[in-house]
Amino acid sequence: MGCTLSAEERAAMERSKAIEKNLKEDGMQAAKDIKLLLLGAGESGKSTIVKQMKIIHEGGFTSEDTKQYKPVVYSNTIQSLVAIIRAMGTLSIPFGDNERESDAKMVLDVIARMEDTEPFSEELLAAMKRLWVDSGVQECLGRANEYQLNDSAKYFLDDLDRLGAKDYMPTEQDILRTRVKTTGIVEVHFSFKNLNFKLFDVGGQRSERKKWIHCFEDVTAIIFCVAMSEYDQVLHEDETTNRMQESLKLFDSICNNKWFTETSIILFLNKKDLFEEKIKKSPLTICFPEYTGKQMYQEASAYIQAQFEAKNKSSAKEIYCHQTCATDTNNIQFVFDAVTDVIIANNLRGCGLY
């Protein structure tokens, strides 16, 4: 008997080849679809990373986007000044000049009338400028770890003339510095290095965490953000819990979660610029009493990194760590390039191609 295949067998073989080809193509397509989950405690810089992806991979902000950030800049600026004024009462810090009391009243009235998103009137701008240079206000700014203050407070308040100009339009840096609490889930899509990225930013505050869970399926990698500069601060939601200790606890639960046994974990030790300034003045022992090293950036940041890496209970899992400044576009572009290379290598390994 010959070895010729019957028409049926030939058809079955063709079908099998076609299925195999489709599976391979599907596999390659799946390897090109990258789902990234941005996690981390509140105010660790996740939303700023999302804005950077828009700048780096989506051509930046349109003039319409820019206009929409104007009221946010006004509100962030005046709310920051009010936070300092209120903290002066709590910390018993008097104004350097008693005449500032009436300026403070004017600023507080704007908030009471919910007009904080409006452009500053000339009168209000002058009052804010006088308050900002007051010695008591500056003393209170120096104790910002003792109350809740936006990181961008100094950035905006140092630039009141520009923000108060009639023709003011937010710059890219202004937009990166704005702060709006993320509620729900923000999703961004972009392509880079022949890959299709879907990036999810999930609300960081404790009350938002239960909303994360349905994002967890088939995640390629997690970018976990930590604000290094928050080692001497407490949470908004619970003013007895140290922010970095909370981050460590959250990282532990994410890193060792059953959902993420196969997931690459990338750790962004963020706000390195603020940390570099703060570590000279505020001891790391506030968060880590056992720390005996120097109050210097290299040694202190390496210690923080080691604390996070020590939470990883799996010898098979590698934590990819980067020290970042989310408001610095060049830094984030460089880091994200490195992150993408890790994802590509891990993906190829998963497909048996590396």
Curated annotation (Swiss-Prot):
Matches recorded under Gene3D superfamilies: GI Alpha 1, domain 2-like (1.10.400.10), P-loop containing nucleotide triphosphate hydrolases (3.40.50.300)
Domain (G-alpha): residue spans on this chain: 32-354
A Gene Ontology molecular function term of the record: G protein-coupled receptor binding
Region (G4 motif): 266-273
Residue numbers spanned by region G2 motif: 174-182
Residue numbers binding GTP: 40-47, 176-182, 201-205, 270-273, 326
A GO term from the CC aspect: heterotrimeric G-protein complex
Lipidation (N-myristoyl glycine): G2
Chain spans, region G1 motif: 35-48
Signal peptide: none
Residues annotated to bind Mg(2+): S47, T182
Lipid attachment, kind S-palmitoyl cysteine: C3
PANTHER family, sorted: G PROTEIN ALPHA O SUBUNIT, GTP-BINDING PROTEIN ALPHA SUBUNIT
Record function comment: Guanine nucleotide-binding proteins (G proteins) are involved as modulators or transducers in various transmembrane signaling systems. The G(o) protein function is not clear.
Protein name: Guanine nucleotide-binding protein G(o) subunit alpha
